[in-house]
């Protein structure tokens, strides 16, 4: 390790991190039959029925949230799951948002975050599972959209 300043160190040979590296892949179901804590309605587009995006969330994505829910033992409230393009624009989402089911399934959710203890527990469990995490004041965004840059964390 090379010291770079007061209490800071860097590793010249950085390790390439990949999401899912610590997750047994056989745990991810391809349908909703093994999902304990969520149902598809929680991830439906919130555009008041103007679109037909009612069952477009990836079950493999939801399985990761289910594993987190089981691990932290706390309820997880979905603020936003799948979005149609129209609703995504209305809420100020990115043009190429993982919330929109571009390839048939969406791969993103915004999770209500009531306090810092929940934030800590959720992030600790989510880091090995998701390569894309956004942190807002009262929500956490997670997605596993393989078409977007990986191993990134941002703040809103």
Briefly describe each language-model feature range.
Residues 31-34, 87, 96:
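Glycine-rich, flexible loop/turn motifs
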Residues 56-58, 85-89, 113-114, 119-123:
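A short linear-motif detector with a strong N-terminal bias
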Residues 6-7, 11-13, 96-156:
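Catalytic cores and adjacent binding grooves of peptidoglycan-active enzymes
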Residues 1-71, 146-151, 155-156:
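Extracytoplasmic cell-surface/polysaccharide-interacting catalytic and binding patches
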Residues 50-51, 77-83, 113-117:
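N-terminal start-of-chain detector that recognizes signal peptides
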Residues 62-93:
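Extended, low-complexity, intrinsically disordered C-terminal regulatory tails
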Residues 3, 47, 91, 129-134:
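Intrinsically disordered, low-complexity segments enriched in small/polar residues
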Residues 42-45, 72-76, 107-110:
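Generic detector of short, locally flexible boundary/turn motifs and exposed helical patches
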